[in-house]
A protein has these predicted regions:
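N-terminal loops that bind phosphate or other acidic moieties
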Residues: 1-147
């Protein structure tokens, strides 16, 4: 069968997920492309992982094993507590236009601690929708999406 297809370029997992959620089975190819590309532009991506070596970046001294929070690939937060780094990263990402915070927690996270953390985030950002999913991703404690 002949089908019209178009590849939507994304660079992060949250961008890909946002593009998928914008897809309308009833819509035309052109309308879907526009909606997906618009959604991708509106999503901010963050991640929480650990440093694999000592370094200094943008005036931040980082030691191997430190917890780092990245926003759009740039190191924004450095600390030794996963949840505190994630909390600060979310604060860096949320602005007056934000409506939704989505977190995907990794295989090395404690589910009970994550649930408590999500309760705290929901309280802090009570005017936003907050979602959390078990991503089971290696290396990254959290992947964060703010739309």
């Amino acid at each position: 069968s002949e089908k019209n297809i178009h590849v939507i370029e994304t660079k992060t997992i949250p961008q890909g997920i946002t593009a998928l959620t914008m897809f309308n089975f009833e819509g035309s190819l052109e309308d879907n492309i526009k909606a997906m590309e618009k959604g991708i532009k509106e999503v901010k991506t963050g991640s929480v992982t650990y440093a694999v070596r000592d370094t200094e970046v943008d005036g931040k001294t980082i030691k191997s094993g430190d917890i780092i929070g990245l926003k759009e690939g740039n190191i924004e937060e450095v600390g030794n507590d996963i949840l505190e780094v994630c909390r600060k990263l979310i604060q860096d990402m949320v602005d007056e236009d934000s409506e939704l915070i989505t977190l995907f927690y990794g295989e090395d996270c404690d589910k009970d601690k994550v649930e408590e953390f999500i309760d705290e985030i929901e309280e802090i950002y009570s005017d936003l929708d907050v979602q959390c999913f078990e991503g089971k991703q290696p290396l990254y404690y959290f992947i964060v999406s703010v739309e």
